[in-house]
Amino acid sequence: MASSLEKLISSFLLVLYSTTIIVASSESRCRRFKSIISFGDSIADTGNYLHLSDVNHLPQSAFLPYGESFFHPPSGRYSDGRLIIDFIAEFLGLPYVPSYFGSQNVSFDQGINFAVYGATALDRVFLVGKGIESDFTNVSLSVQLNIFKQILPNLCTSSSRDCREMLGDSLILMGEIGVNDYNYPFFEGKSINEIKQLVPLVIKAISSAIVDLIDLGGKTFLVPGNFPLGCYPAYLTLFQTAAEEDHDPFTGCIPRLNEFGEYHNEQLKTELKRLQELYDHVNIIYADYYNSLFRLYQEPVKYGFKNRPLAACCGVGGQYNFTIGKECGHRGVSCCQNPSEYVNWDGYHLTEATHQKMAQVILNGTYASPAFDWSCSGSESVDKEYSFSS
C-alpha cells in the first residue's frame, strides 16, 4: 500500500515537474509585446532620413509617388506604402513605429525606430579606411545603438516600469542592416572576393549590437538576413551582360550576386545560433528575407505579380525600367499605374505588396527560424494568411 502511494506521489511530482518545464518553455517563447524597437537602414526607415535631411535638399521619399499607396502624403518610407515593420506592428496590434528623429514625444508606448536610409553595420570611418568612400549616411548601427543608450534613462523615468522590464517587453527588430556595407563597394566596382572580406566584420557588428541589447534587458530579437541582390533592377542594370550564362534561365536573376547574399546569411545564421546557445534566456529569431522574397521572383503570377517581376514600378529606361541617375522621384521619371502588381518599387526597394507578402510568411513561421509563438501576442489572427488593414 505504502509502495503504491509512493509511486503515485512520485508520478504526480514527475507530471508536475514536466508541466512546469513546458510552461516555462512556453513563456520564454510566447510574449505579449508592448512596443517595437527598430534599428537598421531604409528597409525599416519610417522617416529618420527625411528628418535628418536639409530642408532645401529633401530626399525623394519626401515626395510622391513615394507613399502613394497608403500614407498620403509621403512619410519618408522608401516604398509606395507600408514596410515590413509596419505590417509587423499591425499584426501585433501596435501603432506604426515612429522615427526617432523628428518625433516630439519619444516613448516605449509608441515604439522607437532608429533605422536610417543608407545606414551601414560598420562605422563610416572604418569603411573609408577600406577605400569605400561613397556618400552614405553617417548613422551606422553603433551610432543608432549609442543614441538609444543615451535616451534610455529618460524613457524609463517617465514610466513605473524599469528599463530592463520595458526592453524585455519589446520586440527588437535588428534591421535589415548590412546590405549597404556591400552596396557601396559593389557600386564602386570592387570584386565579390574583396567584398566578401567585409562579411565577418558585418556579422560581428550585428552580433555585438544584439549582445549590448541583451545586457540592457532585451529578450526577443527578430534579425533579418540579406536579399537576393541579383534580382534587383539596380544590380541587374549595373552588371548587365548579354551572356546568357550570367543569368538564371528561370528567374533572370544574377546567380553570383545571389550567392553572395546567401553567403552573408549563412554566416549570420551561424552567429545567431551561437548567441542563442550562449544566452538561452532570450529568443533570437532569424527572418529569412532572402527566400521570402526570392519565391516571388520564381512564381510571380502565383502571388499576384506581373510575369515580369524584375522591372521596377517607378523608374525609366532599359530592360528593368531603371537608369542610374534617373531614379524614382526625378523629373521625367514615371510610375506604374498599379504598384501592387510589381515586386520592386524603385530599383533599390520593394513595393508595399511585396512587403506584405514577406511579412505574412515571416510571421506565420514559414520563413522564420525558429518559428515564434505569436499566440499570446495580442493579434487576433494566427492563421497561415494574415489579414492586414488596407
Swiss-Prot record:
Stored Pfam families: Lipase_GDSL
Transmembrane segments: none
Compartment annotation: Secreted
Keywords linked to the UniProt accession: Glycoprotein, Hydrolase, Lipid degradation, Lipid metabolism, Secreted, Signal
Active-site feature positions: S42 (nucleophile), D346, H349
Keyword Acyltransferase among record annotations: no
One Gene Ontology cellular component annotation held by this UniProt entry: extracellular region
GO MF term set: hydrolase activity, acting on ester bonds
Record family assignment: Belongs to the 'GDSL' lipolytic enzyme family.
Full protein name: GDSL esterase/lipase At1g28640
Organism per entry: Arabidopsis thaliana
Lineage: Eukaryota, Viridiplantae, Streptophyta, Embryophyta, Tracheophyta
